[in-house]
Swiss-Prot record:
InterPro entries: Ribosomal_uL14 (IPR000218), Ribosomal_uL14_bac-type (IPR005745), Ribosomal_uL14_CS (IPR019972), Ribosomal_uL14_sf (IPR036853). Part of the 50S ribosomal subunit. Forms a cluster with proteins L3 and L19. In the 70S ribosome, L14 and L19 interact and together make contacts with the 16S rRNA in bridges B5 and B8. GO terms for molecular function: large ribosomal subunit rRNA binding; structural constituent of ribosome. It holds the Pfam family Ribosomal_L14. It comes from Oenococcus oeni (strain ATCC BAA-331 / PSU-1). Belongs to the universal ribosomal protein uL14 family. This is Large ribosomal subunit protein uL14. NCBIfam families: rplN_bact (TIGR01067). One of its GO terms (cellular component) is cytosolic large ribosomal subunit. It comes from the Bacteria. GO terms for biological process: translation. The lineage of its organism: Bacteria, Bacillati, Bacillota, Bacilli, Lactobacillales. Keywords: Ribonucleoprotein, Ribosomal protein, RNA-binding, rRNA-binding. Gene3D superfamilies: Ribosomal protein L14.
Amino acid sequence: MIQQESRLKVADNSGAREILTIKVLGGSGRKFANIGDMIVATVKQAIPGGTVKKGDVVKAVIVRTVSGVHRIDGSYIKFDENAAVIVRDDKSPVGTRIFGPVARELRDNNYMRIVSLAPEVL
């Protein structure tokens, strides 16, 4: 579960390395975000020459969480880190590559471009 002030690793080549959650989108008073949810975040660490800079306010979608997610078939999937992909307003990723596996729940939330760029979908 990702909440306000949570720090996440960025799993794409947009230039950001770490982001800090400002707000969880999707209703007033919503406190937590899981895999496939959109957040508003600020860039805390960035590489030189990247598309996004340190201090930029961006939207991102959660692709991996340590807390994991329950599936309908009874299985449960967890990851070793919390990670997100920076996206534009039309849900397309800013970067051109995705690093690491992503969860299958992104397909249900119509993030097909992220799923197609990912090296592995779990």
